[in-house]
């Protein structure tokens, strides 16, 4: 049966292409709908007015009449749709009016006739569709439908194909989800019928790569079902050439040699200070890299005390990585030598490739890399750091603080911001990697590696685009259950689908699709650079929450209000404090304080009050996370608060009780030192802000849910 439907649709699409068209007519759309069991109303194509009258009489009751022309895509704009036509006289009038309007709209349009369609009962209008996204490929969409769809833009997206549960989840992912369940006396619609329409559309576009867009708008949803009043199918002008892909084992093998090399060659190494080749050599040597370092320069015998080689092919033994520090015009010939030498990875620092319009030059090096099996990092990058190997293969400032955060950036400027942030906050990193033009190696390769790397506890990535969104999603889904993945997607205000031929295409702006697909993959999306860096720094510090109950303990009522707002803004839940727990908190706070949630201990309390309430919050198993609001007083100075909090948290950790604890410190400049101390002792703390600590806690909760741990 499945093969039969594919053959039927294949025959139709081939005929459409043979006629030089990319848009299917309504009758052709019905053939596709019938093949994939997409529910549509009864309809017929009338080639003259008498046929229209006969078809309308057969359907009984009012009908909808629509122009059928391969040259008129938006029928309503052409005056080619009349709804609620009833009776032979009105059918005749409507038929002639539609033809007349179509001629006025486009005098050269080919008119095949008028579609006579059963008028569907009133119901909730929704849209079901699919587009071919340049990053993620086939993507299915769902949202509120009708003429306001492009105004409201209440739409959600998933990778196609979707299974029934994924399709059903889309109904709860729009802002107006409750409308489908019935509001103000309106009945609930048949949600499973809508989900089936979504699933079948996703199967259709997955079976036929040449289908660029499918639009069911509107779909009329009622308690009895969901029927597409209109179906539009648009074919792509051409199908893009598939890019070369690598298997997981291939990726891990090459990435292991890149991130844990035993031997590195520097092509373009130099004795002259100020040269990139000199900076790379100095960083490798001064950083303490224990592997072999081979300078390559045809004009030198010795570079920084190391024997220099005329060509990389002269280097003895096996080489894992070749770092290029030569002008772009010389890269291709040197890469040929790297390929003949059998080197696994080429780190291409030079600029002057696709980013400057030299696409052919970049295509040339990619072809060389593929021919020899050399993976390319870059070009147009600052290099990379692999701290656990004491490897600093870059011409920028060195960094050697080891830790659990892996950071990548597509931009060199962002890479240096990462470096400065890490140094300022004393953040330990496992790696910092520049991706630049991403001619070959990209985020999914790095995700695959960092997901398996025992030294990496959190991955944060700045990206401007993804070469292969599906490969990224696959890598993210494999990684997220093990460790958080944070993404900062730049360019979120991009215009999107400018030349879309359907409602769905117009709705599928770049960022709208990225937002839903990244969420589907379990990725934590950071709204800005600072948030990405703070999430990366803080998430490995926080233990995984074991439940949703959050309690705020604060010394300042104003902070408590702001912290409560932040909890709600981040999709978290303040615990309803039961009477016995309320009574326990009240034993430690003054009569003019406030229990409940937040627990307001007031600002003039001594350290013992902070300690007692924090202990109670950690001790009670019904509380899952603590948010602390500190107010600087002479009674309890910042470092006193920091030390007692760190001590109590450490004590409970030793007892096997670990809960996320974040803190907001308001006060004079001493709170900055206190926050750094708390961070270093397992409590995520920030000065002068109530939003940031709760945002980090919210990110931890989002990861825990995506990883299936909560």
Each predicted region: which residue ranges?
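Catalytic-core regions of core metabolic enzymes
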Residues: 1-710
């Amino acid at each position: 049966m499945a093969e039969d439907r594919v053959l039927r649709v294949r025959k139709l699409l081939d005929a459409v292409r043979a006629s030089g068209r990319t848009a299917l007519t309504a009758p052709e759309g019905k053939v596709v709908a019938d093949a994939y069991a997409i529910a549509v109303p009864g309809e017929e194509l009338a080639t003259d007015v008498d046929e229209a009258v006969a078809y309308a009489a057969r359907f009984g009751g009012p009908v909808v009449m629509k122009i059928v022309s391969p040259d008129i895509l938006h029928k309503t704009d052409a005056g080619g749709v009349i709804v609620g036509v009833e009776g032979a006289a009105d059918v005749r009038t409507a038929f002639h009016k539609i033809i007349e309007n179509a001629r006025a709209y486009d005098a050269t349009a080919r008119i095949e006739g008028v579609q006579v369609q059963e008028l569907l009962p009133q119901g909730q209008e929704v849209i079901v569709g699919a587009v071919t996204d340049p990053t993620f490929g086939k993507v299915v969409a769902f949202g509120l439908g009708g003429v306001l769809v492009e105004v409201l833009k209440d739409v959600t997206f998933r990778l196609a194909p979707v299974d029934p549960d994924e399709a059903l989840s889309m109904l709860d992912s729009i802002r107006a989800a409750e409308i489908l369940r019935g509001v103000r006396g309106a009945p609930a619609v048949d949600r499973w019928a809508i989900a089936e329409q979504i699933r079948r559309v996703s199967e259709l576009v997955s079976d036929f790569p040449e289908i660029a867009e499918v639009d069911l708008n509107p779909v009329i949803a009622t308690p009895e079902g969901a029927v597409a009043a209109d179906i539009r199918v648009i074919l792509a002008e051409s199908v893009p050439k598939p890019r070369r892909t690598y298997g997981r084992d291939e990726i891990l093998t090459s990435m292991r040699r890149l991130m844990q090399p035993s031997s590195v060659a520097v092509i373009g190494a130099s004795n002259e200070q100020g040269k990139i080749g000199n900076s790379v050599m100095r960083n490798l040597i001064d950083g303490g890299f224990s592997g072999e370092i081979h300078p390559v320069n045809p004009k030198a015998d010795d570079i920084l005390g190391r024997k220099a080689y005329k060509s990389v092919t002269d280097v003895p033994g096996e080489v894992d990585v070749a770092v290029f520090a030569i002008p772009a015009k010389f890269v291709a010939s040197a890469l040929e030598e790297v390929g003949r030498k059998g080197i696994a990875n080429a780190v291409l620092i030079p600029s002057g490739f696709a980013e400057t319009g030299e696409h052919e030059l970049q295509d040339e090096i990619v072809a060389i890399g593929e021919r020899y099996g050399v993976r390319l990092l870059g070009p147009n990058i600052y290099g990379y750091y692999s701290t656990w190997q004491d490897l600093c293969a870059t011409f920028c400032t060195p960094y050697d603080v080891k830790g659990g955060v892996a950071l990548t950036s597509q931009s060199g400027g962002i890479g240096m911001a990462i470096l400065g942030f890490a140094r300022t906050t004393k953040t330990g990193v496992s790696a910092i990697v520049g991706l630049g033009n991403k001619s070959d190696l990209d985020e999914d390769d790095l995700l695959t590696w960092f997901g398996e790397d025992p030294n990496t506890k959190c991955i944060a990535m700045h990206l401007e685009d993804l070469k292969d969104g599906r490969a990224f999603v696959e890598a993210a889904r494999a990684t997220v259950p093990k460790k958080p993945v944070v993404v900062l997607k730049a360019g979120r205000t991009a215009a999107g689908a400018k030349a879309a031929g359907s409602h769905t295409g117009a709705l599928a702006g770049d960022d709208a699709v990225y937002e839903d697909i990244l969420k589907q993959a379990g990725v934590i999306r950071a709204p800005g650079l600072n948030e990405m860096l703070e999430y990366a720094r803080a998430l490995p510090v926080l233990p995984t929450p074991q439940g949703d109950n959050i309690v705020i303990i604060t010394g300042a009522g104003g902070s408590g209000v702001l912290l409560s707002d932040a909890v709600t803004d981040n999709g978290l839940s303040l615990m309803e404090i039961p009477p016995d727990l309320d009574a326990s908190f009240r034993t430690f706070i003054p009569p003019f304080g406030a229990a409940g949630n937040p627990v307001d201990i007031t600002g003039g309390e001594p350290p013992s009050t902070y300690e007692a309430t924090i202990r109670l919050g950690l001790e009670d198993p019904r509380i899952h996370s603590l948010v602390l609001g500190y107010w600087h007083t002479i009674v309890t100075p910042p470092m006193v608060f920091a030390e007692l909090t760190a001590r109590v948290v450490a004590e409970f950790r030793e007892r096997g009780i670990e809960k996320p604890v974040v803190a907001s410190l308001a006060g004079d400049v001493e709170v900055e030192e206190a926050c750094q101390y708390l961070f270093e002792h397992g409590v995520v703390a920030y000065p002068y802000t109530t939003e940031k600590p709760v945002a980090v806690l919210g990110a931890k909760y989002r990861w825990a849910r995506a990883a299936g741990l909560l």
